[in-house]
Regions:
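Noncatalytic, solvent-exposed loop/strand surfaces
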Residues: 1-223
Length: 223
């Protein structure tokens, strides 16, 4: 939500749209038509003082004005079924799909045209979204491989293979990444140039939802 508005990405085969609702009344504030499908959710970013709502879909990534629904920019770089939401850090948007790979897009300032900086076509997520922070991009896959890339260049920093796959997205607290696998095993590792496992607790049941961190607690939904 932003400035009293709740945003809903309603991408599907027919009657796709992006909607904004007034949080206080529940009334529609605006809506824009879309002609794409996806399984992803929007993210809200501060692009050099201008708030932008960023959506991924089966063909592209789009940036919208969250107050009006105006399309600000559009980059064709995706394909196939897209479940991963975008990630953002330091002026760069990271979007991925199994069919089209991961693209790092410099969205620049308010008048600049977005440009693709680099692509990654190796181990790619099925549903998990990338995590971007402090010059790193964490990319988990459904078959258990986790890659750490340099956010500026796309160079592989490290890669680690786990016994289980990941459908939920990684979350960050300080410099610690929390990533839960499909069988409920939590991998806790440090964000950095080398893989450093800090702990591996489990919840004892399958997990597909992304954990939420509030204060000093982490909330996990199992099956």
């Amino acid at each position: 939500s932003h400035q009293g508005l709740l945003f809903v990405q309603y991408d599907q085969e027919t009657d796709a749209k992006l909607l904004a609702f007034d949080l206080a009344s529940g009334e529609p504030a605006w809506q824009v038509k879309r002609d794409v499908i996806s399984w992803s959710s929007p993210i809200l970013v501060d692009n050099k003082g201008r708030m932008e709502l960023i959506l991924t879909n089966s063909r592209a990534v789009d940036g919208y004005d969250p107050m009006t629904g105006k399309l600000l920019w559009h980059v064709e770089c995706l394909g196939g079924e897209v479940a991963s939401s975008a990630a953002y850090a330091d002026g760069i948007v990271f979007v991925s799909s199994e069919e089209a790979g991961l693209s790092a897009i410099d969205i620049g300032g308010h008048d600049a045209q977005p440009k693709i900086l680099w692509r990654w076509d190796d181990a790619l997520p099925d549903a998990a979204s990338p995590l971007a922070k402090d010059g790193y991009v964490i990319l988990p896959t459904g078959f258990g491989v986790v890659s750490c890339l340099d956010a500026k260049t796309g160079k592989l920093r490290w890669e680690k293979e786990f016994d289980r796959g990941f459908w939920s997205s990684p979350v960050l607290a300080g410099d610690r990444v929390y990533l839960i696998d499909s069988h409920g095993g939590m991998q806790v590792f440090r964000l950095g140039d080398a893989f450093e496992l800090l702990g591996a607790p489990g919840i004892g049941e399958a997990a597909y939802a992304t954990p939420a961190i509030v204060g000093d607690r982490i909330y996990i939904r199992g099956l």
